[in-house]
Every structure is written in C-alpha cells, then in structure tokens.
Amino acid sequence: MLGGNDPHLLHRAKAEADASVEIDPALGVGHWMCAVVALYQRDFDMSAEKFFEAEALAPNSADLLLQHADALAHFGEAEVAWEKFQQAIDLNPLAPDIYWWAGASIAFKREDYGAAVELCGRMEDDEPALRVLTASHALHGDLAAAREAGSRLQENYPGMTAREISSLSPDRDPVANEKFYQALRLAGIK
C-alpha cells in the first residue's frame, strides 16, 4: 500500500474505510479497506477479522482474494496464502502485475525463491516488486542478479538502509523481516 508507513495517510484511509462500512455494511469493500489499513497499522487480529468479513460479503472478488492472500502471508500463514492466491488467479487468469507481485511475495514467504523470481518475471514492469525480487535473487543464490536488482531498488529508496527497507513490510513475525534484511544485505544494500 502506497503510504503504508505514513501514520497520517493511514488515519485518513481508516476514516474513509470506516465511513464506507457505516454507509453500507453489506458491501465488502469497506471491510476490505479496514483490513488493509489494520494490516499496515500492524493490528493483525483486526486485519484478519476484517478480511474474513469482507470475503464473506464478496467471495468471488479476485482482487479481494489476492489482498487477503497477501495479508495471510504477512500474518505468517504462507501455505494458506498460496492457496488463496491460486484461487484469485483462477478467477482472474489474465491478471495485472499486482497479482504477480503479491504471488512473488507469498512465494518468498514460502521460501520458494525461484518461484518468486519467476512470478516477478511475469510482470510487465517489475519496479514495484524490486524489494521481493532483490531478496529472492539473493536467497536463491544469484548474487549478481540480486545486486543488479538491489541497485535499482536503492534508486527507489535513496538513502534508506537495508534495515529501513525491510521494516516496510508489515510482518507479524520479526523473523520474517530479519530474513528479508539479511537477503538485502547479501544483495549489497548497506
């Protein structure tokens, strides 16, 4: 989520999501947005609750399933996340780049770094996925590709350290962020 680490933007997004739920509680999108905001506020239990409410209201929304899958991976439930990602792809086989980015992130959490690289390769523009691409190349053992992607990543995050970049991911388990940090270090990011 763009601005996912900006408390002011998260506060505004939460207010709008809450208003959406108040206007029409039977519409899944408000619950969905509440879930996304809660994820980036690191309120994992609320995020999980809101994603389940949203999915109950809109069970055939491929975009919702995708975001729920991504959130499940951040919660530490990578295998369940992968199944939900597959459901989203089944509903939207001509998926846009964000699907492949989310799938790569989930594959990374499953420690399937080759699949993560392959999913990034399906993107028309891999720039949004440079964090996961860099880390996946590093942990897959292709340090030359990791350093190349890492150079591009540093252009997008000028002046940020590997620790700061890795902390952008809202993971429940600190071990996940530490693994990501170590991968970025392998790619040559300080």
What are these regions (language model features)?
Residues 42:
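Charged DNA-binding/catalytic regions of mobile-element recombinases
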Residues 4-21, 46-51, 55, 62-190:
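Alpha-helical protein-protein interaction modules
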